[in-house]
Amino acid sequence: MKVLVASNNAKKLGELRTILENAGLSSVEVVPLSAIDAYDEPVEDGRTFADNALIKARAGAHHSGLITIADDSGFAVEELNGMPGVLSARWSGQHGNDATNNELVLAQMKHVPEERRHAAFVSVCALVTPDGDEHIVEGRWEGRMLTAPRGANGFGYDPLFVPAEEDAAGTGRTSAEMSPAEKNAISHRGKALQQLVPIIAGYSTFF
């Protein structure tokens, strides 16, 4: 069975392959978006992570005729009513500018005390079949937001985020101070992808 991932991100593709192999589903072939001819990526104009994930998964399934998985993720700060949320990549108005995005959210949270700095990374994955079946799963990585960035690994809001697991262990590292392997083992995307395993397994006898 082939499963299209609506992305060319090697990390996302590899993470799903590893999860499927560990679940005994090594016969499932993970196909990148680059393998699909004449594909026009849809506009992600949804109001929620689920909206955007479904937009991408529906487009992929319709165009390719394959079961398609897509994800949308971002940084959600409780004090900011869950924002930056779906606007995480362009929070400062410049798409993909991590430095200015971080500066803006830090400024917005400047006077917020420690006890009100709860934040989470959120990943929503959608799986859509060519027949129109749709499944939505969500992974959350809970923690808190710092008052200044720390760490050189990762990207996005990683330097501002201390996972709850780090606080529980007494180490207090940001996700930008963790190794990629440590981060992937407990991250929001991994948690979401794990929930797709039984769904994919259920379709493996039909496609």
Swiss-Prot record:
InterPro entries per record: dITP/XTP_pyrophosphatase, ITPase-like_fam, RdgB/HAM1
Function: Pyrophosphatase that catalyzes the hydrolysis of nucleoside triphosphates to their monophosphate derivatives, with a high preference for the non-canonical purine nucleotides XTP (xanthosine triphosphate), dITP (deoxyinosine triphosphate) and ITP. Seems to function as a house-cleaning enzyme that removes non-canonical purine nucleotides from the nucleotide pool, thus preventing their incorporation into DNA/RNA and avoiding chromosomal lesions.
Subunit structure: Homodimer.
PANTHER family: INOSINE TRIPHOSPHATE PYROPHOSPHATASE, INOSINE TRIPHOSPHATE PYROPHOSPHATASE/HAM1 PROTEIN
Swiss-Prot/TrEMBL cofactor(s): Mg(2+)
Binding site for Mg(2+): 72
Catalysed reaction equations from the record: XTP + H2O = XMP + diphosphate + H(+); dITP + H2O = dIMP + diphosphate + H(+); ITP + H2O = IMP + diphosphate + H(+)
Domain of life: Bacteria
Endpoints of the signal sequence: none
Species this chain originates from: Corynebacterium diphtheriae (strain ATCC 700971 / NCTC 13129 / Biotype gravis)
Transmembrane segments: none
Protein name, per record: dITP/XTP pyrophosphatase
GO biological process per UniProt: nucleotide metabolic process; purine nucleoside triphosphate catabolic process
Similarity comment: Belongs to the HAM1 NTPase family.
Residues bound to substrate: 7-12, 73, 155-158, 183, 188-189
GO molecular function: dITP diphosphatase activity; ITP diphosphatase activity; metal ion binding; nucleotide binding; ribonucleoside triphosphate phosphatase activity; XTP diphosphatase activity
Keyword Nucleotide-binding found: yes
Documented EC number(s): 3.6.1.66
Keyword Metal-binding: yes
Note accompanying the cofactor annotation: Binds 1 Mg(2+) ion per subunit.
Pfam families in the cross-refs: Ham1p_like
Record keywords: Hydrolase, Magnesium, Metal-binding, Nucleotide metabolism, Nucleotide-binding
Residues of the active site: 72 (proton acceptor)
A single Gene Ontology CC term: cytosol
